[in-house]
């Protein structure tokens, strides 16, 4: 037995059984990994707020955000992380169905974000759901979710993916998310009186997808543009300023339904610089959304998708980056 194991054993032996310290505690509020092994759980410290399990895994009863141990929490706040999610076979999570969307987010990625910003059974809302990566991710970790999208084909693809994966199919709505969320009667009906713990969105990034393809994308789509829809309400068909204003409006509409200390998490990718235009879209989004009352920017995580195909952009004349990363911008509702 090494030194670490000895320290864990000593800490566990010195702690008292959880049920002795909290005989009337609502066990349903505990993480499943404690709840399912409650007879092994112990509490330590003067305040008896730290739960310790036989393997040394700990959970603090003051944690109002999620059901993670301290060690898991540390992993999830890493500011830069890389993944290589498969796009074939069982581990692709029905990518064969979801690939009708030009940029489907991996359900495993969305699940991991949801795990940090919610507790079990809390509500996740996605107003730009696409083919449902957020909803699939929520189902994978015992959360609830609701989604909206303009494109009925994408919504149907989500339902088919959920069926194939044998995951719960959550409520979905087809329509303009800004129009739907601006209608309090309709939004109250959609949410059914529930508070939102996490608004998790991957909006179309301005008119990026409406441009002709270059580089590696040509192999998949040809040179044609691949807009998400032809609708003028689609953020993906808007110019920069119109896009930023529409994105801000989409979040403002939902703010009063987000719980205090709830989070808004937004995926954004920069455009390539052009002349004197630096095109740091993530910075512009942070500034625009930080204008919303009671919503504060808390930081970002940078996701690098190592499965993205590389292409010699600019060769042999100048540097042009292969942008395999996206910014995950994190905001919190303070009041």
Model regions and ranges:
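Class I S-adenosyl-L-methionine-dependent methyltransferase catalytic core
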Residues: 1-335
């Amino acid at each position: 037995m090494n030194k670490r194991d000895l320290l864990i054993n000593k800490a566990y032996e010195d702690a008292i059984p959880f049920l002795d310290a909290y005989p009337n505690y609502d066990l349903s509020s505990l993480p499943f990994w404690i709840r399912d092994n409650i007879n092994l759980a112990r509490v330590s410290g003067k305040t008896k707020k730290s739960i310790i399990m036989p393997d040394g895994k700990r959970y603090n009863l003051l944690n109002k955000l999620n059901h993670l141990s301290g060690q898991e929490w540390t992993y999830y706040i890493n500011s830069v992380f890389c993944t290589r999610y498969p796009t074939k076979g069982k581990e692709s999570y029905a990518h064969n169905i979801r690939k009708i969307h030009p940029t489907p987010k991996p359900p495993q990625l969305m699940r991991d974000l949801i795990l940090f910003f919610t507790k079990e059974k809390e509500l996740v809302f996605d107003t730009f759901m696409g083919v449902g990566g957020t909803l699939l991710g929520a189902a994978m970790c015992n959360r609830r979710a609701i989604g909206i999208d303009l494109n009925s084909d994408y919504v149907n693809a989500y339902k088919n993916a959920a069926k194939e994966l044998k995951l719960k199919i959550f409520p979905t709505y087809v329509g303009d998310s800004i129009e739907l969320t601006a209608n309090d009667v309709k939004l109250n009906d959609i949410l059914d009186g529930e508070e939102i713990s996490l608004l998790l969105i991957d909006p179309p990034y301005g008119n990026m997808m409406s441009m002709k393809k270059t580089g590696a994308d040509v192999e998949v789509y040809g040179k044609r543009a691949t807009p998400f829809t032809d609708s003028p309400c689609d953020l993906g068909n808007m110019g920069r300023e119109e896009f930023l204003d529409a994105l801000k409006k989409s979040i403002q509409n939902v703010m009063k339904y987000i719980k205090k200390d709830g989070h808004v998490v937004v995926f954004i990718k920069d455009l390539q610089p052009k002349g004197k235009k630096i095109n740091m879209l993530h910075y512009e989004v942070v500034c625009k959304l930080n204008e919303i009352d009671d919503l504060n920017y808390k930081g970002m995580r940078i996701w690098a998708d190592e499965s993205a195909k590389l292409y010699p952009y600019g060769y042999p004349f100048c540097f042009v980056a292969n942008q395999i990363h996206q910014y995950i911008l994190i905001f919190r509702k303070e009041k």
